[in-house]
């Protein structure tokens, strides 16, 4: 009975999500040719205002990682999980400068993605194609993260009636169908519903769990300090190696990487003007306050459901939810967590499709005028590959996140420095501009 109620609530909200995505695209003109259709599908026609950009980019911070991965690392290690709050807040500060710059460059030259910018900046279409291939490889673990997270949610709220393998497939099918038909605009609309549910459910759990299990925060924190003090300092619980040096370097690198993440850039390019991005850079850090909730509740689960190991720790928060709440409430919280997978996963798959449609497949003459259709096919292929990885190479959610960020960091010099430093040339060309010749190499001796 509980499984029926929870999955029914979940099913109704998923149907509403798809309907909302379709409604968002109704009446939107394709523009001139398929390229116009690609711009509308991939960057929302560059017409999204402050509210939509805010909820869309906030979706980057509130994924299934927030509900499951942050709670899991809070359960396993404790304090090191705070790197998430650190790098995102610093990333928003950097984005205050970088976001408007990327938006202006793309707007001026009619570009729709990070690979477009690289190809245009260095005048090498093949370089844009190479970046598209590399970025796809780097982003697949993050798509896998969202499939894993949503699959865990679906299986858990069904009280085990739906196996994890089927739950992973449901996550893939719902998100792939959603992104193919709705594009970035649909993701922005659904982000509004997601954010309302995230704020409401996390706000409720922040008060309910400590009261229900510990009679309030006072007794809970007393037990945490007395019995689990190791979780409150670096390097956290166990021999994790996640000390202060790891925290500082990871936070710094991720804060730089997040501003050139293809999905972040998609949010930048969807804005109707640069001021929208500056306002969002100031407002978004306040949203990070909610991230402390799953981290704390993950540590609360240490006393309620001890003994979770490996990937099982991702279930720490939902173990508390299923154990203490009625089925309809489990369904609603499951919907919030699922939407926290769907929105970012949709944007990731959308970006992968756009990169290939614009920078790789467009190099094939027959496909040049069919970029949007080609991009949608790539979305399905990329989602299928991520689903295959989920079945064959499972991992904890935080590890998958770190893999993607560490890999994307390799593109930082090309993307960020290439746009900020106009004299930077491909491969540090042998013949720099004459006014800078002495800075690049010493003068040759006469022979």
Regions found by a protein language model. Name each.
Residues 11, 16, 130-145, 178, ...:
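Selective recognition of specific alpha-helical transmembrane segments in multi-pass small-molecule
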Residues 110-119, 182-193, 260-292, 313-316, ...:
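Hydrophobic, small-residue-rich membrane helices and short re-entrant helix-turn-helix hairpins
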Residues 16, 20-31, 99, 139-147, ...:
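Hydrophobic alpha-helical segments and their helix-loop junctions in multi-pass secondary transporters
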Residues 1-68, 179-182, 201-207, 214, ...:
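Membrane-interface "cap" regions at the ends of multi-pass membrane proteins
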Residues 121-129, 136, 354-395:
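Loop-to-transmembrane helix boundary motifs in multi-pass membrane proteins
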Residues 39-110, 243-249, 253-257, 264-309, ...:
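Membrane-interface helix-loop-helix modules in multi-pass membrane proteins
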């Amino acid at each position: 009975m509980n499984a029926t109620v929870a999955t029914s609530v979940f099913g109704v909200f998923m149907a509403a999500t798809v309907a909302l995505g379709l409604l968002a695209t109704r009446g939107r003109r394709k523009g001139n040719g398929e390229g116009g259709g690609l711009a509308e599908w991939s960057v929302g026609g560059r017409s999204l205002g402050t509210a939509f950009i805010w909820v869309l980019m906030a979706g980057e911070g509130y994924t299934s990682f927030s509900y499951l991965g942050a709670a899991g690392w809070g359960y396993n290690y404790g304090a090191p999980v705070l790197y998430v709050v650190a790098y995102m807040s610093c990333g928003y500060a950097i984005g205050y400068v970088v976001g408007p710059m990327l938006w202006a460059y793309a707007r001026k030259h009619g570009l729709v993605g990070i690979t477009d910018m690289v190809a245009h900046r260095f005048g090498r279409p093949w370089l844009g194609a190479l970046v598209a291939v590399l970025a796809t490889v780097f982003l697949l673990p993050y798509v896998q993260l969202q499939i894993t997270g949503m699959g865990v949610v679906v299986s858990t709220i069904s009280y085990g009636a739906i196996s994890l393998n089927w739950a992973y497939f449901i996550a893939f099918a719902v998100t792939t169908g959603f992104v193919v038909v709705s594009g970035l605009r649909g993701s922005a609309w659904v982000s509004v519903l997601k954010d309302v549910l995230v704020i409401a459910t996390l706000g409720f759990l922040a008060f309910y769990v400590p009261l229900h299990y510990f009679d309030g925060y006072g007794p809970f924190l007393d037990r945490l300090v007395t019995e689990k003090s190791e979780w409150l300092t670096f390097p956290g619980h166990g021999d994790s190696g996640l000390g202060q040096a790891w925290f500082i370097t990871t936070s710094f690198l991720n804060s730089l990487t997040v501003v050139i993440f293809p999905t972040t850039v998609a949010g930048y390019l969807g804005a109707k003007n640069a001021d929208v991005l500056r306002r969002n850079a100031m407002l978004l850090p306040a949203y990070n306050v909610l991230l402390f909730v799953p981290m704390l509740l993950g540590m609360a689960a240490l006393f309620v459901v001890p003994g979770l190991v490996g990937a099982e720790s991702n279930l720490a928060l939902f173990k508390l939810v299923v154990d203490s709440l009625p089925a309809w409430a489990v369904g609603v919280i499951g919907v919030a967590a699922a939407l926290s997978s769907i929105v970012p996963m949709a944007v990731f798959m959308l970006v992968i499709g756009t990169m290939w449609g614009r920078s790789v497949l467009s190099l094939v003459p027959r496909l040049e005028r069919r970029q949007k259709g080609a991009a949608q096919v790539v979305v399905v292929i990329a989602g299928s590959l991520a689903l295959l990885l989920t079945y064959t190479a499972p991992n904890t959610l935080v590890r998958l996140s770190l893999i993607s960020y560490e890999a994307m960091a390799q593109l930082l010099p090309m993307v960020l420095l290439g746009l900020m430093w106009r004299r930077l040339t491909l491969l540090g060309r042998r013949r720099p501009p004459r006014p800078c010749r002495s800075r690049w190499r010493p003068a040759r001796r006469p022979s």
